[in-house]
Amino acid sequence: MAKSPFLELSYDILLEISTYLDYKDIVHLSETCKSLSYVFDDKTIWHRFCARVQGLTNVVPVVDDNYKRPYAVWKDRGYAYSWGQQIRNYLGRVVNTNQYPRDRPGALTGKDVRSTIQVQVGGYGMYLLNENGNLYVTGVPNNVGPELMRDLEPIVKIHAGREFCLALGETGHLYQVSLKTRICLTDEQNMLSAYRGRIANFKSGWDSHSAYVPGIGFLVWHTGRESEAQLFQPEASMKEFVLNDYVHCAGFLVYTVASPQKKGAVFRLDLDQATQHTLGRELKRFASHDPHQGWHLAGSFETFTCLSDDGNTVYMGHANTKQVDDDPVIHDFLQNRGIKQLAHGDHHHLYLTSDHSIWSWGVELRYCGCLGLGSLHLQEQTSDPSIVSDPRTARNIVSIPHQIHFSGTCYSVAAGGWQSAALAISESVLPEVNVPPITTFSIIRPSRVPALRFLAAPATRTLERDG
């Protein structure tokens, strides 16, 4: 085969080569000469990098389609934050003292998670995916930070439920992972082996999990029964069915479809039916009143929400929202807010607005701190009727949203169980410090992840939640 000098390759071929290169390679080639700079500064390359980072283009302005700047800002100052219940190191933090309280957002500054592109919160910890496709998990007792999940191929997408996280590998394999288990669901002889490379979307739920395969339907399996997958087909004929978005809650799915005739329609599919041939049914009163507005779905445990494209309309539903004529819950405090994203834990809720602020409301059980508003039970009683601290049940109840303050610009939020997380850009995270080795019995384990640093912020109030 004849060899072709690199500089003589066509523009299209060089763009194709760029898909196999990482950030540093692209930067070095761009700085080599004007010809390569012209190619490797192409907006499609940098848009691809930005698109990998969950929510990044929500926060950093993109000027004249120049995605290079947002990505460079993220590389330099992007951090993952965590707050909430900290037992068994659920937050992945190195230190937890009065200076670094669990009820306020704290940045994870370990080098392995500094380049987090996706964060998911489960019931018993968090999952962080970095730009190299490495998946890290918190909740490891006696560990000093998030721990690498080994024996996985590079991962491109994750979703966490109560006990497990589903992870899609770059070769099309789908994995179900936790601290103690690694199952390749699409491996030969396993239940999803016929669908490797065909899975378009997947969700991990409360006690079951699902994968959507175009033209086939939803494949659903329960925790502990990973050898059995039930097929649920939302329509009698799947040939023309195109899924737009869906959420997997406790015992049911809520979904929207990519059809101009059904834009703005919301459907529910129950998973506890005697037969899996039950069709999805439209929740007619959840239909968007604006024919130009579709829905973005969020959901966890027993709650789901529908967020309009413009971020100004939010409909909420619950496990008991089953009938076709059931009304959505419409909170005035969620309307016309310019919301970019919603996230739900077991009993608490977060939303991110277009001005990059985070708001929270709901219930903190056992004063777990998942609202990120500080130690509400220790603060002086306020005249704000939306904040109630009940020492008899050790819970804080915040009935309307309150802003979470920290010195960072947030571009994505996540919630699950009694924990919360965010991805943000910050200029004021304190430098990393060395952590002394941790001794467990007679084994000495050196620290692998530098200390978390909490970003001090003025004391804040809270926002509320609904039942």
From Swiss-Prot:
Q: Which superkingdom heads the taxonomic lineage of this protein's source?
A: Eukaryota
Gene3D superfamilies annotated for this entry? 1.20.1280.50, Regulator of chromosome condensation 1/beta-lactamase-inhibitor protein II
* Domain F-box, first and last residues per copy: 3-49
Name of the protein described by the UniProt record: F-box protein pof9
Q: Which UniProt keywords apply?
A: Cytoplasm, Nucleus, Repeat, Ubl conjugation pathway
Identify the stretches annotated as RCC1 repeats: 77-131, 302-354, 355-417
Naming one, the record's GO cellular component terms include:
nucleus
- Specify where it is mainly localized: cytoplasm
Alphabetized SUPFAM superfamilies for the sequence = F-box domain, RCC1/BLIP-II
Gene from which the chain derives: pof9
Organism, by scientific name, is Schizosaccharomyces pombe (strain 972 / ATCC 24843)
